[in-house]
Amino acid sequence: MIQNEKKHLILYTGDVTKNLKSGIWNASRIKSNLELVKALENVKLTKFTGDGDENLKKNIKVLVPVNEKPQKLDGKQEEYEIIVKLFFLDGENIDIKKREETLSQVFYNLHMLFGIDFVSTLVVSFPHITFLKESGNSSSNEIYDSIDEIPPQEIQSWVDTWKLLEEKVGEGKIGTLGVSEFGVNELQRLISSVNVVPESTQINIGQNCKLPNDLLNFADRHHLKLFFHSDPSALLSESEITSVIHKACPEIPNPARVDWVIRYTILTRHTAVIHQKGYIVQSTYTE
């Protein structure tokens, strides 16, 4: 066996609306990953061995809940509103080629698990960016204090990644695009360089009660929708994912890191009731 060989592991939480106990939903404005962490801690995972699974051919292990095997959506996909938030957690080594592979993995796994081929809205979260700069960010997850601190190559990575998303829009796989934690400066840099502009930005303003006027005016001029959210920039830490993997796969002793996370929310279109909500996480470890 090759020493220090990198391996990938995909974890599927199942429907968190069924698995989570009441009272742990984060309805406040305080950033928290409690929903995801509890979902991973509370679920018993087993290896998925679906027929024709391309992950198996790539030697990627997939773990799914023991008592909730993936099922295709009931009825036609047009009956559902499917919202996906994609968290890129590759801040230490941003690689556009790998992000392209991530997008392929995301759509492949959505199809494999649920038969989903079209996402109504995809919101992307980039590393190192937070709207509220003084919100007490962890030193383990570098956050830039201003747009001037962001290296030009990282800003270019937003644009290059966005162009990959634009291709998915052109292919009919995504309806609309949104961003997370982008303020006016970040939005200006992005919008000036892309063809498909974001239709929304998700921000966290902490305990503040009022949105900045410059953002309100910018959103009005560019027809942007503004949404509040409570997701931390680093959605899942190395220690958190390592603990989950050790529990599910004791044979994997080494630390793991998270490559990307998606949260999917599937709404019944005519009633706006949540049909399913869950997370898919890809991590990397070495053998």
Swiss-Prot record:
Signal sequence residues: none
Key words, A-Z: Cytoplasm, Glutathione biosynthesis
Main localisation: cytoplasm
Pathway the protein takes part in: Sulfur metabolism; glutathione biosynthesis; glutathione from L-cysteine and L-glutamate: step 1/2
BP-aspect Gene Ontology terms: cellular detoxification; cysteine metabolic process; glutathione biosynthetic process
InterPro entries in UniProt: Gclm (IPR032963), NADP_OxRdtase_dom_sf (IPR036812)
Cell inner membrane is among the record's keywords: no
Cellular compartment(s): Cytoplasm
A GO CC annotation given for this chain: glutamate-cysteine ligase complex
Keyword Cytoplasm in annotation: yes
Single Gene Ontology MF annotation: glutamate-cysteine ligase catalytic subunit binding
Family note: Belongs to the aldo/keto reductase family. Glutamate--cysteine ligase light chain subfamily.
Subunit structure: Heterodimer of a catalytic heavy chain and a regulatory light chain.
Protein name: Putative glutamate--cysteine ligase regulatory subunit
Species for this entry: Schizosaccharomyces pombe (strain 972 / ATCC 24843) (Fission yeast)
Lineage: Eukaryota, Fungi, Dikarya, Ascomycota, Taphrinomycotina
